[in-house]
Amino acid sequence: MESTRARTAAGVERQRLTQPNGWWAMALLIATEATLFGSLIASYFYLRFQAPSWPPPGVPSPSVALPLVLTGILVATTVPMYAATRVAGGAARVRAAWWLVALAAAVQAGYLGVQIHLFISDLQDFSPAANAYGSIYFTLLAVHHAHVAIGLVLDSWILWKLGRGLTNYRLVGLRVIAFYWYFVALVGIAVVLTQLYPSL
């Protein structure tokens, strides 16, 4: 009897220390995406130190205030995502988790909308095909914007699933999507600091 209890306790402890497969899949995706962003940022600085002037003549230096505010807003959306993972423990709290994710998604969508507007505005000022600065600048921003858009698709999926009730599978999905947003927010900080480097 004592050995059965010990084995059961050891099994529970092992289960607590392991993560579901979905979590590991997201961790691997994030690792590969971190490599992508690391390569893009390294390319930015490689090109920067090869160029006699950065940005090149005729290209305006990036403005600082709005990108920093927008990044702060994106980072702030991790708070309701985290809170949703914490409250989504019982049936009565699924609704609260749903509203927290919906709040985060609405703010994230607003962030993406403003960023796309700024992206289009920058395209009118200089071209990605004109020089190395334009190429890496627009590539870095476009890749980050694509990650935000993918996150919004994930938000929509989990909102639809949470609307149908909470299961262990959906709870894992919620945690994995929150994990993804933590990464996107962290990368957003790196991207905006790289983008603003000439103006800092």
Predicted regions and their residues:
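...captures the hydrophobic TM-helix bundle architecture rather than a specific catalytic motif
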Residues: M1-L200
